[in-house]
Amino acid sequence: MCSLGLFPPPPPRGQVTLYEHNNELVTGNSYESPPPDFRGQWINLPVLHLTKDPLKAPGRLDHGTRTAFIHHREQVWKRCINVWHDVGLFGVLNEIANSEEEVFEWVKTACSWALALCGRASSLHGSLFPHLSLRSEDLIAEFAQVTNWSSCCLRVFAWHPHTNKFAVALLDDSIRVYNANSTIVPSLKHRLQRNVAALAWKPLSASVLAVACQSCILIWTLDPTSLSTRPSSGCAQVLSHPGHTPVTSLAWAPNGGWLLSASPVDAVILVWDVSTETCVPLPWFRGGGVTNLLWSPDGSKVLATTPSAVFRVWEAQMWTCEAWPTLSGRCQTGCWSPDGNRLLFTVLGEALIYSLSFPERCGTGKGHVGGAKSATIVADLSETTIQTPDGEERLGGEAHSMVWDPSGERLAVLMKGNPQVQDGNPVILLFRTRNSPVFELLPCGIIQGEPGAQAQLITFHPSFNKGALLSVCWSTGRITHIPLYFVNAQFPRFSPVLGRAQEPPAGGGGSIHEVPLFTETSPTSAPWDPLPGQSSAQPHSPHSHL
Protein backbone atom coordinates (compact mmCIF):
# COMPACT_ATOMS: atom_id res chain seq x y z
CA MET A 1 0.00 0.00 0.00
CA CYS A 2 1.31 3.43 -0.96
CA SER A 3 1.64 6.12 1.70
CA LEU A 4 2.61 9.79 1.70
CA GLY A 5 5.78 9.01 3.62
CA LEU A 6 7.22 7.63 0.37
CA PHE A 7 6.71 10.89 -1.54
CA PRO A 8 9.65 13.14 -2.41
CA PRO A 9 9.58 16.53 -0.67
CA PRO A 10 7.49 19.28 -2.29
CA PRO A 11 9.22 21.92 -4.43
CA PRO A 12 10.82 24.86 -2.61
CA ARG A 13 8.53 27.78 -1.92
CA GLY A 14 8.27 30.10 -4.90
CA GLN A 15 8.93 27.31 -7.42
CA VAL A 16 6.29 26.08 -9.89
CA THR A 17 6.01 22.64 -11.48
CA LEU A 18 6.81 22.76 -15.21
CA TYR A 19 6.88 19.17 -16.50
CA GLU A 20 7.90 15.58 -15.73
CA HIS A 21 11.02 13.98 -17.19
CA ASN A 22 12.71 10.70 -16.22
CA ASN A 23 10.03 10.08 -13.58
CA GLU A 24 10.87 13.36 -11.82
CA LEU A 25 8.96 16.63 -11.70
CA VAL A 26 10.99 19.59 -12.95
CA THR A 27 10.37 23.00 -11.38
CA GLY A 28 11.26 26.59 -12.22
CA ASN A 29 10.81 30.13 -11.00
CA SER A 30 7.95 30.83 -13.40
CA TYR A 31 5.91 29.16 -16.14
CA GLU A 32 7.93 28.94 -19.30
CA SER A 33 7.99 26.97 -22.53
CA PRO A 34 9.46 23.46 -22.45
CA PRO A 35 13.21 23.08 -23.06
CA PRO A 36 14.39 22.79 -26.69
CA ASP A 37 14.56 18.99 -26.51
CA PHE A 38 10.80 18.85 -25.85
CA ARG A 39 9.43 21.70 -27.96
CA GLY A 40 8.80 19.39 -30.90
CA GLN A 41 6.48 17.37 -28.67
CA TRP A 42 4.50 20.33 -27.34
CA ILE A 43 0.98 21.41 -28.31
CA ASN A 44 0.50 25.09 -29.10
CA LEU A 45 -2.13 25.70 -26.43
CA PRO A 46 -3.31 29.22 -25.54
CA VAL A 47 -1.93 30.75 -22.36
CA LEU A 48 -4.92 31.78 -20.25
CA HIS A 49 -5.10 33.99 -17.21
CA LEU A 50 -8.77 34.87 -16.62
CA THR A 51 -9.08 37.23 -13.69
CA LYS A 52 -12.12 37.39 -11.47
CA ASP A 53 -12.59 41.18 -11.48
CA PRO A 54 -14.46 41.65 -14.82
CA LEU A 55 -16.72 38.69 -14.10
CA LYS A 56 -20.02 38.91 -12.28
CA ALA A 57 -22.30 36.15 -11.11
CA PRO A 58 -25.62 36.59 -12.94
CA GLY A 59 -26.78 33.22 -11.69
CA ARG A 60 -27.47 34.84 -8.33
CA LEU A 61 -29.31 37.84 -9.75
CA ASP A 62 -32.94 38.27 -10.79
CA HIS A 63 -33.02 38.43 -14.59
CA GLY A 64 -36.74 39.13 -14.70
CA THR A 65 -38.31 42.42 -15.74
CA ARG A 66 -40.65 42.49 -12.76
CA THR A 67 -38.72 45.30 -11.04
CA ALA A 68 -39.05 47.56 -14.10
CA PHE A 69 -42.83 47.95 -13.69
CA ILE A 70 -45.01 49.66 -11.12
CA HIS A 71 -46.34 47.22 -8.56
CA HIS A 72 -49.90 46.14 -9.27
CA ARG A 73 -52.00 43.89 -7.06
CA GLU A 74 -53.22 41.02 -9.24
CA GLN A 75 -56.12 38.73 -8.54
CA VAL A 76 -55.41 35.67 -6.43
CA TRP A 77 -55.86 33.19 -9.26
CA LYS A 78 -53.33 35.04 -11.41
CA ARG A 79 -50.87 35.14 -8.54
CA CYS A 80 -51.36 31.40 -8.02
CA ILE A 81 -50.58 30.70 -11.67
CA ASN A 82 -47.37 32.76 -11.47
CA VAL A 83 -46.29 31.12 -8.22
CA TRP A 84 -47.05 27.66 -9.64
CA HIS A 85 -44.55 28.23 -12.44
CA ASP A 86 -41.92 29.67 -10.07
CA VAL A 87 -42.24 27.57 -6.91
CA GLY A 88 -44.82 24.84 -7.43
CA LEU A 89 -47.59 23.47 -5.22
CA PHE A 90 -46.03 24.70 -1.98
CA GLY A 91 -46.04 28.28 -3.29
CA VAL A 92 -49.70 28.05 -4.37
CA LEU A 93 -50.79 26.84 -0.94
CA ASN A 94 -48.79 29.60 0.73
CA GLU A 95 -50.29 32.26 -1.57
CA ILE A 96 -53.86 31.17 -0.81
CA ALA A 97 -53.25 30.82 2.92
CA ASN A 98 -51.82 34.35 3.13
CA SER A 99 -54.41 36.04 0.88
CA GLU A 100 -56.44 38.74 2.61
CA GLU A 101 -60.14 38.71 1.71
CA GLU A 102 -60.14 37.19 -1.76
CA VAL A 103 -60.96 33.58 -0.87
CA PHE A 104 -63.30 31.84 1.53
CA GLU A 105 -62.10 31.39 5.08
CA TRP A 106 -62.46 27.62 4.97
CA VAL A 107 -60.24 27.50 1.84
CA LYS A 108 -57.54 29.49 3.65
CA THR A 109 -57.81 27.17 6.65
CA ALA A 110 -57.53 24.07 4.47
CA CYS A 111 -54.46 25.48 2.73
CA SER A 112 -52.89 26.33 6.10
CA TRP A 113 -53.40 22.74 7.27
CA ALA A 114 -51.99 21.44 3.99
CA LEU A 115 -48.95 23.70 4.43
CA ALA A 116 -48.40 22.34 7.92
CA LEU A 117 -48.56 18.76 6.65
CA CYS A 118 -46.20 19.57 3.80
CA GLY A 119 -43.82 21.18 6.28
CA ARG A 120 -43.79 18.08 8.49
CA ALA A 121 -43.29 15.79 5.50
CA SER A 122 -40.51 18.03 4.21
CA SER A 123 -38.87 18.04 7.63
CA LEU A 124 -38.96 14.24 7.80
CA HIS A 125 -37.61 13.93 4.27
CA GLY A 126 -34.92 16.50 5.05
CA SER A 127 -33.82 14.54 8.12
CA LEU A 128 -33.28 11.50 5.90
CA PHE A 129 -31.58 13.51 3.12
CA PRO A 130 -30.18 16.75 4.64
CA HIS A 131 -28.82 17.99 1.31
CA LEU A 132 -32.37 18.51 0.00
CA SER A 133 -32.73 21.55 2.27
CA LEU A 134 -29.87 23.34 0.48
CA ARG A 135 -30.32 25.95 -2.21
CA SER A 136 -29.48 25.04 -5.78
CA GLU A 137 -26.20 26.97 -5.68
CA ASP A 138 -25.19 25.29 -2.43
CA LEU A 139 -26.12 21.87 -3.82
CA ILE A 140 -23.85 22.38 -6.81
CA ALA A 141 -21.00 23.67 -4.63
CA GLU A 142 -21.36 20.71 -2.25
CA PHE A 143 -20.98 18.03 -4.91
CA ALA A 144 -18.83 19.80 -7.53
CA GLN A 145 -15.44 18.35 -8.45
CA VAL A 146 -14.01 21.88 -8.34
CA THR A 147 -13.08 23.40 -5.01
CA ASN A 148 -14.91 26.59 -3.98
CA TRP A 149 -17.37 26.48 -6.88
CA SER A 150 -19.43 29.41 -5.55
CA SER A 151 -16.72 32.04 -5.91
CA CYS A 152 -14.04 30.65 -8.22
CA CYS A 153 -13.72 32.32 -11.62
CA LEU A 154 -13.12 28.99 -13.43
CA ARG A 155 -16.02 26.71 -12.58
CA VAL A 156 -15.85 23.90 -15.13
CA PHE A 157 -13.19 22.73 -17.60
CA ALA A 158 -13.67 20.11 -20.34
CA TRP A 159 -11.28 18.84 -23.01
CA HIS A 160 -12.62 17.77 -26.38
CA PRO A 161 -12.03 14.00 -26.63
CA HIS A 162 -10.30 14.11 -30.03
CA THR A 163 -8.88 17.59 -30.72
CA ASN A 164 -6.78 20.23 -28.97
CA LYS A 165 -9.83 22.18 -27.93
CA PHE A 166 -11.39 22.83 -24.53
CA ALA A 167 -14.32 24.68 -23.01
CA VAL A 168 -14.28 26.71 -19.80
CA ALA A 169 -17.32 27.81 -17.80
CA LEU A 170 -16.75 31.09 -15.96
CA LEU A 171 -18.22 32.74 -12.90
CA ASP A 172 -20.61 34.84 -15.02
CA ASP A 173 -22.15 31.64 -16.49
CA SER A 174 -20.59 32.25 -19.89
CA ILE A 175 -18.63 29.51 -21.65
CA ARG A 176 -15.54 30.12 -23.75
CA VAL A 177 -14.20 27.64 -26.28
CA TYR A 178 -10.46 27.68 -27.02
CA ASN A 179 -8.83 25.92 -29.96
CA ALA A 180 -5.09 25.45 -30.46
CA ASN A 181 -5.55 25.94 -34.21
CA SER A 182 -7.64 29.11 -34.12
CA THR A 183 -7.46 32.55 -32.58
CA ILE A 184 -11.27 32.85 -32.53
CA VAL A 185 -12.73 32.26 -29.07
CA PRO A 186 -16.51 31.70 -29.17
CA SER A 187 -18.37 32.86 -26.07
CA LEU A 188 -21.56 30.93 -25.37
CA LYS A 189 -24.41 32.69 -23.56
CA HIS A 190 -28.05 31.73 -23.14
CA ARG A 191 -30.86 32.99 -20.94
CA LEU A 192 -31.22 29.49 -19.44
CA GLN A 193 -27.49 29.05 -18.95
CA ARG A 194 -27.36 29.67 -15.20
CA ASN A 195 -25.29 27.93 -12.50
CA VAL A 196 -23.28 25.83 -14.94
CA ALA A 197 -22.17 22.68 -13.11
CA ALA A 198 -20.82 20.40 -15.85
CA LEU A 199 -19.61 20.39 -19.46
CA ALA A 200 -19.35 17.35 -21.74
CA TRP A 201 -18.17 17.20 -25.36
CA LYS A 202 -19.92 14.60 -27.50
CA PRO A 203 -17.50 11.88 -28.65
CA LEU A 204 -17.06 11.34 -32.40
CA SER A 205 -18.45 14.80 -33.05
CA ALA A 206 -16.53 17.94 -33.88
CA SER A 207 -18.44 20.58 -31.92
CA VAL A 208 -21.39 19.35 -29.86
CA LEU A 209 -21.16 20.48 -26.24
CA ALA A 210 -23.60 19.54 -23.47
CA VAL A 211 -24.02 22.00 -20.59
CA ALA A 212 -25.59 21.18 -17.21
CA CYS A 213 -27.57 24.21 -16.01
CA GLN A 214 -29.86 25.24 -13.19
CA SER A 215 -33.11 24.28 -14.90
CA CYS A 216 -32.16 22.30 -18.01
CA ILE A 217 -29.49 20.82 -20.24
CA LEU A 218 -28.24 22.89 -23.18
CA ILE A 219 -26.82 21.13 -26.24
CA TRP A 220 -24.67 23.62 -28.15
CA THR A 221 -23.85 22.82 -31.79
CA LEU A 222 -20.95 24.98 -32.94
CA ASP A 223 -19.78 25.40 -36.52
CA PRO A 224 -15.98 24.87 -36.55
CA THR A 225 -15.64 27.06 -39.64
CA SER A 226 -17.63 29.98 -38.23
CA LEU A 227 -15.83 33.25 -37.53
CA SER A 228 -18.43 34.40 -35.02
CA THR A 229 -17.40 34.91 -31.41
CA ARG A 230 -21.01 35.02 -30.16
CA PRO A 231 -22.99 32.05 -31.50
CA SER A 232 -26.72 32.61 -31.52
CA SER A 233 -28.86 31.05 -28.82
CA GLY A 234 -30.57 29.25 -31.69
CA CYS A 235 -27.50 27.00 -31.80
CA ALA A 236 -28.53 25.58 -28.42
CA GLN A 237 -31.01 22.74 -27.98
CA VAL A 238 -32.90 22.68 -24.65
CA LEU A 239 -33.52 19.42 -22.79
CA SER A 240 -35.56 19.45 -19.58
CA HIS A 241 -37.49 17.03 -17.39
CA PRO A 242 -39.79 17.81 -14.41
CA GLY A 243 -38.05 17.49 -11.06
CA HIS A 244 -34.65 16.99 -12.64
CA THR A 245 -33.03 20.24 -11.46
CA PRO A 246 -30.41 21.39 -10.87
CA VAL A 247 -28.46 19.19 -13.25
CA THR A 248 -25.00 18.62 -11.79
CA SER A 249 -23.50 15.81 -13.87
CA LEU A 250 -23.42 14.77 -17.53
CA ALA A 251 -21.79 11.77 -19.19
CA TRP A 252 -21.73 10.85 -22.87
CA ALA A 253 -21.40 7.23 -23.90
CA PRO A 254 -17.97 6.67 -25.49
CA ASN A 255 -19.69 6.05 -28.83
CA GLY A 256 -21.74 9.27 -28.52
CA GLY A 257 -25.07 7.45 -28.67
CA TRP A 258 -26.49 8.32 -25.25
CA LEU A 259 -26.24 11.20 -22.82
CA LEU A 260 -26.72 10.54 -19.11
CA SER A 261 -27.75 13.29 -16.69
CA ALA A 262 -28.10 13.40 -12.91
CA SER A 263 -29.37 15.74 -10.21
CA PRO A 264 -28.86 15.57 -6.41
CA VAL A 265 -32.61 16.07 -5.88
CA ASP A 266 -33.79 13.44 -8.39
CA ALA A 267 -33.48 9.75 -7.56
CA VAL A 268 -33.34 8.64 -11.20
CA ILE A 269 -30.70 8.84 -13.90
CA LEU A 270 -32.02 10.05 -17.25
CA VAL A 271 -30.75 8.47 -20.47
CA TRP A 272 -31.24 11.00 -23.27
CA ASP A 273 -31.62 10.47 -26.98
CA VAL A 274 -30.59 13.98 -27.96
CA SER A 275 -31.74 13.69 -31.57
CA THR A 276 -35.37 13.09 -30.51
CA GLU A 277 -35.18 15.08 -27.24
CA THR A 278 -36.59 12.10 -25.34
CA CYS A 279 -35.30 10.40 -22.22
CA VAL A 280 -35.74 7.13 -20.36
CA PRO A 281 -35.29 7.06 -16.56
CA LEU A 282 -33.18 4.27 -15.16
CA PRO A 283 -35.08 2.46 -12.38
CA TRP A 284 -34.04 3.51 -8.90
CA PHE A 285 -35.33 2.14 -5.64
CA ARG A 286 -34.02 4.61 -3.08
CA GLY A 287 -34.33 8.37 -2.91
CA GLY A 288 -31.69 10.96 -2.26
CA GLY A 289 -30.51 11.87 -5.74
CA VAL A 290 -27.41 11.21 -7.83
CA THR A 291 -24.37 13.46 -7.54
CA ASN A 292 -21.91 12.31 -10.19
CA LEU A 293 -21.82 10.08 -13.28
CA LEU A 294 -18.73 8.57 -14.85
CA TRP A 295 -18.82 6.28 -17.88
CA SER A 296 -16.02 3.72 -18.14
CA PRO A 297 -13.74 4.25 -21.18
CA ASP A 298 -14.81 0.92 -22.70
CA GLY A 299 -18.49 1.92 -22.53
CA SER A 300 -19.53 -1.13 -20.51
CA LYS A 301 -20.22 0.44 -17.09
CA VAL A 302 -21.33 3.68 -15.44
CA LEU A 303 -20.41 4.86 -11.95
CA ALA A 304 -23.24 6.69 -10.15
CA THR A 305 -22.44 8.30 -6.80
CA THR A 306 -25.12 9.48 -4.37
CA PRO A 307 -25.33 11.87 -1.41
CA SER A 308 -25.76 8.87 0.90
CA ALA A 309 -23.24 6.23 1.95
CA VAL A 310 -23.71 4.06 -1.13
CA PHE A 311 -22.67 4.17 -4.77
CA ARG A 312 -23.81 2.10 -7.72
CA VAL A 313 -22.26 0.74 -10.89
CA TRP A 314 -24.54 0.16 -13.86
CA GLU A 315 -23.78 -2.15 -16.76
CA ALA A 316 -24.74 -0.65 -20.12
CA GLN A 317 -26.21 -3.71 -21.86
CA MET A 318 -29.29 -4.65 -19.85
CA TRP A 319 -29.00 -1.61 -17.53
CA THR A 320 -28.82 -3.49 -14.25
CA CYS A 321 -26.81 -2.21 -11.31
CA GLU A 322 -24.99 -3.32 -8.20
CA ALA A 323 -24.59 -1.23 -5.05
CA TRP A 324 -21.57 -0.90 -2.75
CA PRO A 325 -22.23 0.66 0.66
CA THR A 326 -19.53 2.72 2.36
CA LEU A 327 -18.98 3.01 6.09
CA SER A 328 -18.21 6.62 6.95
CA GLY A 329 -19.74 8.72 4.16
CA ARG A 330 -20.60 9.15 0.51
CA CYS A 331 -18.31 8.43 -2.39
CA GLN A 332 -16.41 11.69 -2.96
CA THR A 333 -14.72 11.00 -6.29
CA GLY A 334 -13.81 8.13 -8.59
CA CYS A 335 -12.04 7.27 -11.84
CA TRP A 336 -11.89 4.27 -14.19
CA SER A 337 -8.87 2.45 -15.57
CA PRO A 338 -8.52 2.63 -19.38
CA ASP A 339 -9.83 -0.92 -19.82
CA GLY A 340 -12.80 -0.32 -17.49
CA ASN A 341 -11.84 -3.24 -15.25
CA ARG A 342 -10.78 -1.21 -12.20
CA LEU A 343 -12.40 1.63 -10.30
CA LEU A 344 -10.47 3.86 -7.91
CA PHE A 345 -12.56 5.92 -5.48
CA THR A 346 -12.42 7.84 -2.23
CA VAL A 347 -14.94 8.24 0.58
CA LEU A 348 -15.86 11.48 2.32
CA GLY A 349 -14.25 11.60 5.75
CA GLU A 350 -11.50 9.08 4.95
CA ALA A 351 -7.91 9.70 3.84
CA LEU A 352 -7.77 6.52 1.76
CA ILE A 353 -7.94 5.49 -1.89
CA TYR A 354 -9.89 2.31 -2.58
CA SER A 355 -9.71 -0.03 -5.56
CA LEU A 356 -12.63 -2.08 -6.85
CA SER A 357 -11.95 -4.63 -9.58
CA PHE A 358 -14.33 -5.84 -12.28
CA PRO A 359 -12.93 -9.04 -13.80
CA GLU A 360 -13.60 -9.20 -17.53
CA ARG A 361 -16.15 -11.86 -18.39
CA CYS A 362 -15.61 -13.72 -21.63
CA GLY A 363 -19.06 -14.34 -23.06
CA THR A 364 -20.68 -15.09 -19.69
CA GLY A 365 -22.52 -13.06 -17.14
CA LYS A 366 -24.11 -10.68 -19.62
CA GLY A 367 -26.41 -8.28 -17.87
CA HIS A 368 -24.41 -8.45 -14.64
CA VAL A 369 -21.88 -5.93 -13.35
CA GLY A 370 -19.68 -8.64 -11.87
CA GLY A 371 -17.60 -6.48 -9.54
CA ALA A 372 -15.65 -7.64 -6.52
CA LYS A 373 -17.60 -8.03 -3.29
CA SER A 374 -15.39 -5.60 -1.40
CA ALA A 375 -12.83 -2.91 -2.19
CA THR A 376 -9.17 -2.94 -1.23
CA ILE A 377 -7.12 -0.03 0.10
CA VAL A 378 -4.32 0.94 -2.29
CA ALA A 379 -3.15 4.27 -0.81
CA ASP A 380 -3.11 5.90 2.61
CA LEU A 381 -3.30 9.70 2.41
CA SER A 382 -3.24 10.28 6.16
CA GLU A 383 -1.35 13.32 7.40
CA THR A 384 2.36 12.84 7.86
CA THR A 385 5.44 14.98 8.40
CA ILE A 386 8.06 15.19 5.66
CA GLN A 387 11.44 16.92 5.55
CA THR A 388 11.88 19.81 3.10
CA PRO A 389 14.68 22.33 2.48
CA ASP A 390 12.54 24.85 4.38
CA GLY A 391 12.07 22.53 7.37
CA GLU A 392 9.36 20.08 8.34
CA GLU A 393 5.98 20.25 6.61
CA ARG A 394 2.80 18.31 7.08
CA LEU A 395 1.19 16.63 4.09
CA GLY A 396 -1.99 14.63 3.63
CA GLY A 397 -5.72 14.61 4.28
CA GLU A 398 -8.87 13.88 2.30
CA ALA A 399 -9.04 13.79 -1.48
CA HIS A 400 -11.43 16.18 -3.22
CA SER A 401 -11.11 14.92 -6.81
CA MET A 402 -9.08 12.33 -8.67
CA VAL A 403 -8.29 11.80 -12.37
CA TRP A 404 -6.54 8.96 -14.21
CA ASP A 405 -4.79 9.63 -17.49
CA PRO A 406 -5.99 7.68 -20.57
CA SER A 407 -2.79 5.60 -20.73
CA GLY A 408 -3.37 4.34 -17.19
CA GLU A 409 0.13 5.34 -16.00
CA ARG A 410 -0.45 8.58 -14.09
CA LEU A 411 -2.98 9.36 -11.37
CA ALA A 412 -3.50 12.92 -10.07
CA VAL A 413 -5.24 13.56 -6.76
CA LEU A 414 -6.43 17.00 -5.66
CA MET A 415 -6.41 17.15 -1.86
CA LYS A 416 -8.80 19.22 0.22
CA GLY A 417 -7.49 22.34 1.89
CA ASN A 418 -6.51 21.84 5.53
CA PRO A 419 -5.33 24.72 7.77
CA GLN A 420 -2.72 22.38 9.27
CA VAL A 421 -1.36 21.24 5.88
CA GLN A 422 0.39 23.48 3.32
CA ASP A 423 -1.10 26.64 4.88
CA GLY A 424 -4.58 25.40 4.02
CA ASN A 425 -3.90 25.26 0.26
CA PRO A 426 -5.14 22.25 -1.74
CA VAL A 427 -2.27 20.01 -2.82
CA ILE A 428 -1.96 17.98 -6.04
CA LEU A 429 -0.37 14.54 -5.61
CA LEU A 430 0.92 12.69 -8.67
CA PHE A 431 1.20 8.88 -8.69
CA ARG A 432 2.65 6.42 -11.18
CA THR A 433 0.29 3.53 -11.86
CA ARG A 434 0.34 0.20 -13.65
CA ASN A 435 -2.60 -2.12 -14.28
CA SER A 436 -0.93 -5.29 -15.53
CA PRO A 437 0.20 -7.87 -14.70
CA VAL A 438 -0.63 -6.59 -11.20
CA PHE A 439 -1.93 -3.22 -10.05
CA GLU A 440 0.76 -0.85 -8.76
CA LEU A 441 0.49 2.63 -7.27
CA LEU A 442 3.77 4.46 -6.68
CA PRO A 443 4.50 8.07 -5.64
CA CYS A 444 5.81 10.44 -8.30
CA GLY A 445 5.75 13.93 -6.80
CA ILE A 446 3.85 17.01 -5.67
CA ILE A 447 2.64 19.60 -8.19
CA GLN A 448 2.93 23.20 -7.06
CA GLY A 449 1.67 26.47 -8.52
CA GLU A 450 2.56 30.12 -8.16
CA PRO A 451 2.68 31.66 -4.67
CA GLY A 452 -0.86 32.39 -3.53
CA ALA A 453 -2.46 30.22 -6.23
CA GLN A 454 -4.70 27.39 -5.07
CA ALA A 455 -5.47 24.43 -7.30
CA GLN A 456 -9.22 24.17 -7.90
CA LEU A 457 -9.69 21.71 -10.76
CA ILE A 458 -7.59 19.02 -12.44
CA THR A 459 -8.12 16.99 -15.61
CA PHE A 460 -6.03 15.07 -18.16
CA HIS A 461 -5.85 15.68 -21.89
CA PRO A 462 -7.67 12.69 -23.44
CA SER A 463 -5.19 12.07 -26.27
CA PHE A 464 -1.69 13.40 -25.54
CA ASN A 465 0.71 11.08 -27.40
CA LYS A 466 3.95 11.78 -25.52
CA GLY A 467 2.80 10.60 -22.12
CA ALA A 468 0.15 12.59 -20.28
CA LEU A 469 -0.88 16.24 -20.12
CA LEU A 470 -2.34 17.49 -16.85
CA SER A 471 -4.43 20.67 -16.98
CA VAL A 472 -4.84 22.61 -13.74
CA CYS A 473 -7.20 25.51 -13.06
CA TRP A 474 -5.93 27.83 -10.31
CA SER A 475 -7.72 30.29 -8.05
CA THR A 476 -5.86 33.16 -9.75
CA GLY A 477 -7.67 32.42 -13.02
CA ARG A 478 -4.65 30.83 -14.67
CA ILE A 479 -4.94 27.55 -16.57
CA THR A 480 -1.68 25.63 -16.80
CA HIS A 481 -0.91 22.53 -18.85
CA ILE A 482 1.80 20.35 -17.32
CA PRO A 483 3.27 17.74 -19.70
CA LEU A 484 4.31 14.45 -18.14
CA TYR A 485 6.79 12.92 -20.59
CA PHE A 486 7.13 9.15 -20.43
CA VAL A 487 7.01 6.14 -22.75
CA ASN A 488 3.79 4.21 -22.48
CA ALA A 489 4.72 0.73 -21.29
CA GLN A 490 1.79 -0.86 -23.13
CA PHE A 491 1.71 1.28 -26.30
CA PRO A 492 5.05 2.96 -27.19
CA ARG A 493 3.09 5.44 -29.34
CA PHE A 494 -0.12 6.14 -27.46
CA SER A 495 -3.31 5.54 -29.42
CA PRO A 496 -6.61 6.40 -27.70
CA VAL A 497 -9.29 3.74 -27.42
CA LEU A 498 -12.88 4.73 -28.20
CA GLY A 499 -14.38 1.57 -26.79
CA ARG A 500 -13.19 -2.03 -26.75
CA ALA A 501 -10.26 -2.65 -29.06
CA GLN A 502 -11.39 -4.33 -32.27
CA GLU A 503 -9.74 -5.72 -35.36
CA PRO A 504 -9.59 -3.36 -38.36
CA PRO A 505 -12.47 -3.87 -40.80
CA ALA A 506 -12.04 -6.10 -43.82
CA GLY A 507 -10.18 -4.40 -46.62
CA GLY A 508 -8.26 -2.13 -44.28
CA GLY A 509 -9.53 0.89 -42.39
CA GLY A 510 -8.56 4.48 -42.96
CA SER A 511 -6.54 6.49 -40.48
CA ILE A 512 -8.49 8.30 -37.84
CA HIS A 513 -7.20 11.58 -39.27
CA GLU A 514 -9.31 10.93 -42.37
CA VAL A 515 -12.63 10.87 -40.52
CA PRO A 516 -14.63 13.80 -41.97
CA LEU A 517 -16.03 14.99 -38.64
CA PHE A 518 -12.58 16.17 -37.53
CA THR A 519 -12.22 18.73 -40.32
CA GLU A 520 -11.45 21.53 -37.88
CA THR A 521 -7.94 20.15 -37.30
CA SER A 522 -5.22 19.49 -39.82
CA PRO A 523 -3.44 16.12 -39.84
CA THR A 524 -0.23 17.71 -38.57
CA SER A 525 -1.92 19.07 -35.45
CA ALA A 526 -3.67 15.88 -34.40
CA PRO A 527 -2.55 15.02 -30.85
CA TRP A 528 -2.12 11.30 -31.49
CA ASP A 529 -0.74 8.88 -34.06
CA PRO A 530 -1.90 5.35 -34.94
CA LEU A 531 0.31 2.44 -34.06
CA PRO A 532 3.12 1.94 -36.58
CA GLY A 533 2.01 -0.28 -39.41
CA GLN A 534 -1.54 -0.49 -38.10
CA SER A 535 -4.65 1.44 -39.05
CA SER A 536 -6.98 2.72 -36.38
CA ALA A 537 -9.83 0.48 -35.33
CA GLN A 538 -13.36 1.51 -35.91
CA PRO A 539 -15.12 2.71 -32.74
CA HIS A 540 -17.28 0.17 -31.02
CA SER A 541 -20.97 0.94 -30.56
CA PRO A 542 -22.30 -1.08 -27.64
CA HIS A 543 -25.86 -2.24 -28.13
CA SER A 544 -28.01 -1.06 -25.23
CA HIS A 545 -31.50 -2.09 -24.23
CA LEU A 546 -33.53 0.63 -22.58
UniProtKB/Swiss-Prot annotation:
Start-end of each WD repeat: 149-188, 191-230, 243-282, 285-324
Role of this protein: Plays a role in the normal development of the peripheral and central nervous system. Required for the correct localization of aurora kinase AURKA and the microtubule minus end-binding protein NUMA1 as well as a subset of AURKA targets which ensures proper spindle formation and timely chromosome alignment.
Motif (Microbody targeting signal): 544-546
Keywords: Acetylation, Cytoplasm, Cytoskeleton, mRNA transport, Nuclear pore complex, Nucleus, Phosphoprotein, Protein transport, Repeat, Translocation, Transport, WD repeat
Known partners and oligomeric status: Interacts with NDC1, the interaction is required for nuclear pore localization. Interacts with the inactive form aurora kinase AURKA. Interacts with PGRMC2.
An example Gene Ontology CC term for this record: nuclear pore
Any single GO BP term: nucleocytoplasmic transport
Protein name (Swiss-Prot/TrEMBL): Aladin
Annotated localization: Nucleus, Nuclear pore complex; Cytoplasm, Cytoskeleton, Spindle pole; Nucleus envelope
Main localization, broad class: nucleus
N-acetylcysteine PTM positions: C2
Region annotation (Disordered) ranges: 500-546
Residues bearing the modification Phosphoserine: S33, S495, S511, S522, S525, S541
